[in-house]
């Protein structure tokens, strides 16, 4: 399973690249989507590689992401009780394992918002106009996407930047 994060905005972007980002549901900076890895997805990612970063997400990071940032439609938090009713999985960990193993697609879960909003990363991005291979942030980063996601999930802070009680 791939985690894809948009790191650059819309200014000066070609229309076909913007359309591809829209098809990937990456309309704003710091939005994340979870995608299955296939030839079509790889082609789309190659087209928008200068505006997004992506890599393979692991079970631990996905569990933390589901627990802290995943929302139902209506912007309600995903709780353990509702998780069991909607997905049939008893815990976040079981759902994360099933998603990573490809047993279920994230888009198949009913009433879950397909785009996950994240905070800007702690200590910022590297150079957003430079590829990850050259010391920047854009493009494929493999397993290192997990470090970036963990820097973007700040426990105890809600989506509006307010401290949760």
UniProtKB/Swiss-Prot annotation:
NCBIfam families, per database record: PRK06049.1, uL30_arch
Pfam families: Ribosomal_L30 (PF00327)
Recorded superkingdom: Archaea
GO CC term (a single one): cytosolic large ribosomal subunit
Lineage of origin: Archaea, Methanobacteriati, Thermoplasmatota, Thermoplasmata, Thermoplasmatales
Assigned protein family: Belongs to the universal ribosomal protein uL30 family.
GO BP of this protein: maturation of LSU-rRNA from tricistronic rRNA transcript (SSU-rRNA, 5.8S rRNA, LSU-rRNA); translation
Subunit structure: Part of the 50S ribosomal subunit.
Protein's name in the database: Large ribosomal subunit protein uL30
InterPro entries registered for this protein in UniProt: Ribo_uL30_ferredoxin-like_sf, Ribosomal_uL30, Ribosomal_uL30_arc, Ribosomal_uL30_euk_arc, Ribosomal_uL30_ferredoxin-like
Gene3D superfamilies for this protein: 1.10.15.30, Ribosomal protein L30, ferredoxin-like fold domain
UniProt GO MF annotations: RNA binding; structural constituent of ribosome
Keyword Nucleus: no
Alphabetized UniProt keyword annotations: Ribonucleoprotein, Ribosomal protein
The keyword Endoplasmic reticulum appears for this protein: no
